[in-house]
């Protein structure tokens, strides 16, 4: 009886110590602060990459950053897996919801935008953001909440 209780307690300790770690993420995914991340070694345009991420796991999307530490973790993950490269993140102006205003403070009434949308990427060598046309291809990192 004492051996059963000891074994049960031991299993409980192991289970509790694994919660909140990489054990919450599927094989091949990396865990950080309750989210799972995976860089993919194939290039897609931004929309196709986002669509791909939504198909990988419920709640999946292109990576979004909410702290320097999170960005550093993902940049390091991308570099360790694939070396140098550029990777899409989930930030874009695809929906063109920017609030534009003329320097004269006049309201924008006339528009003649080109159809080009811009999306944001990071280099696997640092976590500085840059933008490029969403139609161009890049590697990407998917994320979902564990």
Swiss-Prot record:
**GO MF terms, alphabetically ordered:** metal ion binding; toxin activity
Q: Does the keyword Calcium apply?
A: yes
Q: Which residues form the C-type lectin domain?
A: 32-143
Record keywords: Blood coagulation cascade inhibiting toxin, Calcium, Disulfide bond, Hemostasis impairing toxin, Metal-binding, Secreted, Signal, Toxin
Paired cysteines (S-S): 25-36, 53-142, 119-134
Q: What else is known?
A: Calcium is required for ligand binding.
PANTHER family from the xrefs? Answer: MANNOSE, PHOSPHOLIPASE, LECTIN RECEPTOR RELATED (PTHR22803)
Summarize the subunit comment. Heterodimer with subunit A of IX/X-bp or IX-bp; disulfide-linked.
Q: What is this protein called?
A: Snaclec coagulation factor IX/factor X-binding protein subunit B
Q: Which organism is it from?
A: Gloydius halys
């Amino acid at each position: 009886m004492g051996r059963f209780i000891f074994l049960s307690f031991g299993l409980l300790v192991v289970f509790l110590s694994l919660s909140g770690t990489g054990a919450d993420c599927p094989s091949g995914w990396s865990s950080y602060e309750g989210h799972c991340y995976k860089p993919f070694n194939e290039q897609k345009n931004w929309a196709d990459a986002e669509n791909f991420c939504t198909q990988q796991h419920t709640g999946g999307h292109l990576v979004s950053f909410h702290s320097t530490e999170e960005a550093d973790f993902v940049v390091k993950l991308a570099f360790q897996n694939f070396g140098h490269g550029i990777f899409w993140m989930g930030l874009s102006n695809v929906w063109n919801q920017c609030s534009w205003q003329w320097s004269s403070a006049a309201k924008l009434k006339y528009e003649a935008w080109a159809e080009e949308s811009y999306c944001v990427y990071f280099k696997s060598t640092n976590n500085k953001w840059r933008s490029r046309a969403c139609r161009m291809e890049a590697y990407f990192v998917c994320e979902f909440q564990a």
